[in-house]
Amino acid sequence: MKSVIFGLQWGDEGKGKVTTYFSKDYDYVVRYSGGSNAGHTVEYTDFKLIHHLLPSFYVKKNVGAIISNGVVLDLEQLVEEIEEFKSKTGTYPKLYISELAHVVLPHHKKLDEKLEQIKGKNAVGTTKRGIGPAYADKVHRIGIRLSDFKNKDKFYEKIKNISKLYKNLYNIEVESIENVLTSYEKLKSHIVPHGEIINLINQNKILFESTQGVLLDIDVGTYPYVTGANCNTTGIQNGVGFPVKTENYIGVFKAYLTRVGNGPFPTEAFGKEGEEIRKRGHEFGATTGRPRRCGWLDLPLLKYAITVSGATELVMTKGDILNGMEKIKVCVAYKIDGNIVDRISSVDDLEKAEPIYETLDGWENHTSKEFNEYLSFIESYVKRKITHISVGPKVEEIIKL
């Protein structure tokens, strides 16, 4: 059995908690894209973990973790995360890392910051974790992979060549990477040939974990305000390096909508309305701490994300955040260039889209009639079944419907 869990919005949908909940029925959770810009918060009854690079797996069962070739790795961050994991759980994760994964180095973070500064008001609003530049170096064929660390002479020769390129192209000095080498030594026992990753995926029940959300995908997201990775479900095969059949596509969305950084957001709520949602949902980034932009659920956009991702079932999170609100707004169409449309053919249209809302009655809690009417309204619009909801921050607070 192979399944994938992914976000249907601009990230921050609660995928980490949902992945952890579902992982109890699988042997391994596989991260196939992204880097330390992800921030998957997983809260148990007695402790909380924030996964940036480690896959989100249920720690109270013998579930393993795989980081595949599609991920760009900040080695120092991963070491810190593993130590934090050990201090909270009392054990180390059963972790395998593909030696084909590329490494985020200090000069990638410098370039990330420099690019944002140069763009000025057109900046994407990245986390400045070096993700985009690391992927760019991969495409430029000057990236460093974990396998490069095995031969120190060749490794230093590559770093020397990269230093020349970065100095000439970007006027950026490549710093000492001794800390990166130290981190590599600590992780070495987890790094395996990619053939071993393929065997593990082929021979076990696998849950693939995406990062960010479909609307941040480098190809089908709200470009250029996207991440550097293929975080859509279409990224699985590239991210693990071989064709793999996935049966279940589990899309996660919030009962409302948030976004970090710049880019179009038709249903963004401003003033007191937006601030109330932000406070209720504690909407601040797990990676950057930045306040998230907040707004109402956008059904045309959700339907678009379902279409491009192939979602077969849905999980709705944070419905409890809206408990007690008298009225809930939901976007059901847009006005674009004077025309009313209930679907988008291109994310470019979002820049000029004016939301058209329906207003529904609020609810007291997830057992209320009005809450179930909200779920039914969404299902009827997007033509997919909501199979689970979460009613609180903990893994144990996910309910199967």
Swiss-Prot record:
GO terms for molecular function: adenylosuccinate synthase activity; GTP binding; magnesium ion binding. Its main location: cytoplasm. IMP binds at D12, E13, G14, K15, N37, A38, G39, H40, T127, R141, Q212, T227, R290. Substrate binds at A286, T287, T288, G289, R290, P291, R292. Its EC number is 6.3.4.4. Binds 1 Mg(2+) ion per subunit. The keyword Magnesium applies. InterPro entries: Adenylosuccin_syn_GTP-bd, Adenylosuccin_syn_Lys_AS, Adenylosuccinate_synth_dom1, Adenylosuccinate_synth_dom2, Adenylosuccinate_synth_dom3, Adenylosuccinate_synthetase, P-loop_NTPase. The active site is at D12, H40. Mg(2+) binds at D12, G39. GO terms for biological process: 'de novo' AMP biosynthetic process; IMP metabolic process. Keywords: Cytoplasm, GTP-binding, Ligase, Magnesium, Metal-binding, Nucleotide-binding, Purine biosynthesis. GO terms for cellular component: cytoplasm. It is found in: Cytoplasm. Pathway: Purine metabolism; AMP biosynthesis via de novo pathway; AMP from IMP: step 1/2. Plays an important role in the de novo pathway of purine nucleotide biosynthesis. Catalyzes the first committed step in the biosynthesis of AMP from IMP. Belongs to the adenylosuccinate synthetase family. This is Adenylosuccinate synthetase. It comes from Thermosipho africanus (strain TCF52B).
